[in-house]
C-alpha cells in the first residue's frame, strides 16, 4: 500500500479509537490528556517506518532512518493491541446495552470510563512486556521427535533450528551474535535455518549477518530460503550466505554420515548410519523466479534409497502435504512466528495448516518454530521466540 493511503487509513483508525475512548475518559483526570497525547504520538509516528525507507540509501541519513523505524514500529505494536482491545470493549458494551434494553440489566455508569482506562492500560502493559520478550535472546526449546525405524546410530541426533530471525532495521549484529553464542553452546550435530533470515539487501545487512559465519556444528549449517529472502533479493543473499560458509539447499539434499564408515563392505553398512537432509525453496518462490519453484520431490532426486531417515527444511508449513507424500519422516518449518502476539495467532490457521509446535501429518512429523527473532513491531506476547533443539529418537513400537 502506498504511503499516502496508508497514512489516511492510520489516521482514520486513530480517529475511531479517539471517539470511542476519549469521551469515556473525560471524567478520569489525568487519563484523558494522557490518552490524547499517546494517540497523537501514535498517529504521527506509525507511518515512519515506511518513510524511513527513503533514508536507507543515504549513509549520512542512516542513523535517522533507524531511529524513525524504531519509533514507528513500537507505536505500531502498541496501537495494534489498542485497536483490538477497543473492538473487544465495544462488543462488550454492545452486549451490556442489549442486556439492559431487553432484560432490564442495570449497567453502572462507571463501566464506560473504567473499561476505557483498562483498554489503555492493557495495551500499554502488553506492549511493554512484548518488547522485553522480543528483545531478549530466544530461549532454547527442546523437542524429541520419535522416528519409526530410526537406526541406532541416529538415536540422539540433534538439529538446532533457527527460523524467522528477520535481520533488519531493529535486529542487528549484537542480537545475531547472542543467538550464535547460544546455539554453539548446544553442541548440535547440525544447524538448520528455515528461512526469513533477512529483511533488507546484502549491502545494508552484510555486516549485521556476519556473525552467522561463527555457527559451529559437526555437520555444518544449512539454510533454506523464506519469502522475505525473495523480497530482499534472494540470489544475492544466497551468494552471500555461501560466502559465509553456510550451505544453502535449493530443492536439493545432502547425505550426512553420522559415524566413520571407512571399510564398509555393503551398501547397508555404508548407509545404516546416514541421514538425508533436504531443503526446498520457499513455498511461494516460483512467483519470484520460476527456476526456484519449491519441490520436495526434486529435493530427493538421486537420494540413496537405503537411507530411510529423511528430514526436510521448508520455510512454510504449507509444504507439508507434498513433503509427506514424498516420503519424509520430519519437516522443520517456521514462517508463522506462532502469531507473534495475541490476537494474530488466532488468524494464522486461515493461511497455514499448523501454527506452532510438533504435529503429525500422515506418516510425517512437522515441527513449526515460533521463530528466533520477530518481524515488524518489536513485540512478542503469548508466542515466545525460540531456538529449537530437535532430537531424533526411536519411535516406541
PLM feature spans:
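Soluble catalytic domains of enzymes that build or remodel membrane lipids, polysaccharides, and related
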Residues: 141, 146-397
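Non-catalytic terminal accessory segments
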Residues: 1-136
